[in-house]
């Protein structure tokens, strides 16, 4: 199986669209008029910052994910590696290990105290006590503030990033098993107009979904509310000029355990892949 690593346009009509199915019946999600920034000057010509971001909050990080972060740094030596944490993530011994391996650890809640946007992000995070939900929001903000690439932490790193990872991108797949743009792996510049569109429309998306369950949030709706379904709606609405679409076989679904794309890791084509541990459930 052969496909380009980067495409400039994909067939949006083939993407799964849960917001056009049962959600509209309940809360008219597809009728939401999101507000967007002026994208006329967006041409994806700025090289991204050389940062890679991971998140682990809610419990002490385990050995598997600790080694994931360290291995990413060993492979991508020219990148700064950030692990975003809360007060539960690290022991003194683990912190020493990360520092000895040049991993930057930052408490996300120490970042959300300075301005109106940060307070807004903090308020959205606090609406639901589910770490998958919180991580969906955190990943958008940390890449907006620092720039670079976000990856879920249940990942395996195989080879260094190259020129394919210089410019803003999202990761997609369109095949017989699934067709979507997910949020487990993406890259944007600091202060990206696209990420600002994501962030500024979070509240409207979250509040819409909360209508389903008497102002509560149910776990099954998180991907539509803050995850891949949410960002896909915004990408389809705007079709940002020259945004890169990276096939997930090269960065998410190329692992040896996969059905369709296992050859990508076996043949050295994947840069990394994810193991889908469902660690936020």
Model regions and ranges:
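Glycosyltransferase-associated regions of secretory-pathway enzymes
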Residues: 1-135, 151-281
């Amino acid at each position: 199986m052969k496909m380009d690593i980067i495409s400039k346009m994909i067939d949006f009509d083939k993407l799964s669209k849960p917001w056009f199915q049962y959600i509209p019946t309940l809360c008219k999600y597809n009728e939401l008029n999101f507000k967007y920034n002026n994208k006329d000057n967006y041409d994806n010509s700025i090289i991204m910052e050389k940062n890679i971001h991971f998140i682990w909050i809610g419990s002490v990080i385990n050995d598997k994910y600790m080694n994931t972060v360290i291995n990413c740094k060993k492979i991508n030596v020219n990148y700064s590696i950030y692990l975003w944490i809360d007060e539960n993530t690290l022991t003194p011994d683990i912190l020493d290990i990360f520092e000895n391996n040049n991993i930057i650890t930052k408490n996300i809640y120490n970042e959300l105290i300075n301005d109106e946007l940060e307070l807004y992000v903090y308020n959205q995070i606090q609406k639901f006590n589910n770490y998958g939900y919180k991580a969906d929001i955190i990943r958008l903000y940390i890449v907006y503030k620092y720039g670079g690439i976000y990856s879920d932490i249940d990942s395996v790193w195989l080879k260094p990033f190259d020129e394919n990872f210089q410019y803003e991108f999202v990761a997609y797949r369109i095949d017989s098993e699934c067709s979507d743009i997910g949020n487990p792996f993406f890259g944007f510049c600091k202060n990206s107009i696209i990420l600002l569109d994501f962030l500024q429309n979070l509240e409207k998306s979250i509040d819409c979904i909360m209508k389903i369950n008497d102002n509560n949030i149910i776990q099954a709706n998180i991907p539509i509310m803050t995850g891949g379904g949410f960002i896909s709606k915004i990408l389809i609405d705007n079709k940002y000029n020259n945004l890169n679409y990276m096939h997930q076989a090269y960065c998410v679904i190329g692992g040896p355990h996969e059905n369709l794309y296992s050859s990508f890791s076996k043949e050295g084509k994947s840069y990394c892949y994810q193991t889908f541990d469902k660690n936020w459930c």
